């Protein structure tokens, strides 16, 4: 299995600079995972705050938008009531009634969230039954990691794709390890970096090269770091990657019920054995990202 080596054979001193340039670019790329996202005002406007009720499995939490709204309402009402302590008793009663009325107007919105862009091993598939062996072990490890990373009752932010998969809303999940931090963290990046999930692209990855088309797709924000995380876990051979020295065989050992989506190869560097180049699945995310940056630079010039 190949890693991030820049010592590829056949590059002689006399090679033309034009031929060597892409290799030099690849060798100087920073593959360090940076799970810190300073979202723009427009991007933050896409986020919906919610509360984690519990985790169904490693890529599907049960969330509640309404409970988060109620929490904010309660905090605001508490502040308002604190300022009205010197008001008449009947006024306080009115406030209490108003608060009760406002709470009942908030519609319950508890449902499953299918995390966009990743897939963890399955615990159970209705048409195929429960997982066993390594698949079951990795599925449970993924769920446990998710529960520790974002415990029940935590506030999260959902970037919804406004689509549903069965009974689950589809969206990217952001969180903050510290409420005071100014940046957001991606749940998807964290799971992939820890080797508990593979990144899956679908058609969304093809939009990355066009900044205007991909503005509504969370991959336009987290895609590069998702690729860095995938390469880190892949080369470290941790968790889902640890079951065989061959990356593909390792994945097929832990994705038996669902099957391993070949789109994960598009997140790997071309130096890796199962990159999109060797798998014939199309341009890698790194190539698409370079195209994206070139278009942004051209637009800004």
UniProtKB/Swiss-Prot annotation:
Keywords attached to this entry: Cell membrane, Endonuclease, Hydrolase, Lipoprotein, Membrane, Nuclease, Palmitate, Signal
Lipidation (N-palmitoyl cysteine): 27
InterPro entries per record: SNase_OB-fold_sf, Staphylococal_nuclease_OB-fold
Annotated region described as Disordered, given as residue ranges: 64-136
SUPFAM superfamilies linked to this entry: Staphylococcal nuclease
Signal sequence range: 1-26
UniProt subcellular location: Cell membrane
GO MF, any single term: endonuclease activity
Residue ranges with Basic and acidic residues bias: 67-95, 120-136
Keyword match Manganese: no
Every TNase-like domain range: 46-243
Residues where lipid is bound covalently (S-diacylglycerol cysteine): 27
Membrane topology classification: Lipid-anchor
Record's keyword annotation contains Membrane: yes
Superkingdom of the source species: Bacteria
Main location: membrane
Protein name in UniProt: Uncharacterized lipoprotein MG186 homolog
Organism: Mycoplasma pneumoniae (strain ATCC 29342 / M129 / Subtype 1) (Mycoplasmoides pneumoniae)
């Amino acid at each position: 299995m190949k890693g991030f080596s820049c010592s590829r054979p056949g590059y002689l001193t006399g090679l033309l600079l034009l031929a060597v340039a892409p290799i030099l670019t690849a060798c100087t790329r920073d593959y360090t995972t940076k799970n810190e996202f300073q979202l723009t005002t427009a991007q933050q406007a896409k986020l919906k705050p919610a509360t984690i009720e519990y985790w169904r499995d490693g890529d599907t939490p049960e969330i509640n938008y309404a409970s988060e709204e109620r929490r904010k309402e309660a905090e605001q009402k508490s502040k308002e009531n604190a300022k009205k302590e010197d008001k008449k008793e009947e006024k306080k009663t009115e406030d209490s009634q108003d608060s009760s009325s406002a709470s009942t107007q908030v519609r319950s919105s508890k449902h499953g969230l299918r995390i966009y862009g990743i897939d963890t091993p399955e615990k159970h598939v209705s048409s195929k039954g429960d997982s066993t062996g390594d698949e079951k072990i990795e599925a449970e490890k993924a769920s446990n990691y998710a529960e520790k990373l974002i415990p029940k009752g935590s506030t999260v932010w959902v970037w919804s794709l406004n689509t549903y998969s069965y009974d689950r809303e589809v969206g990217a999940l952001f969180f903050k390890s510290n409420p005071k931090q100014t940046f957001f963290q991606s749940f998807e990046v964290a799971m992939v970096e820890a080797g508990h999930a593979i990144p899956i692209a679908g058609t969304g990855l093809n939009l990355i090269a066009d900044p205007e088309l991909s503005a509504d797709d969370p991959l336009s924000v987290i895609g590069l770091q998702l690729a860095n995380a995938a390469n880190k876990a892949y080369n470290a051979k941790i968790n889902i990657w640890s079951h065989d020295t061959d990356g593909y065989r390792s994945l097929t050992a832990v994705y038996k019920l669902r099957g391993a989506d070949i789109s994960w190869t598009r997140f790997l560097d071309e130096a890796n054995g199962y990159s999109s180049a060797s798998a014939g699945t199309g341009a890698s995310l790194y190539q698409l990202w370079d195209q994206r940056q070139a278009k942004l630079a051209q637009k800004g010039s």
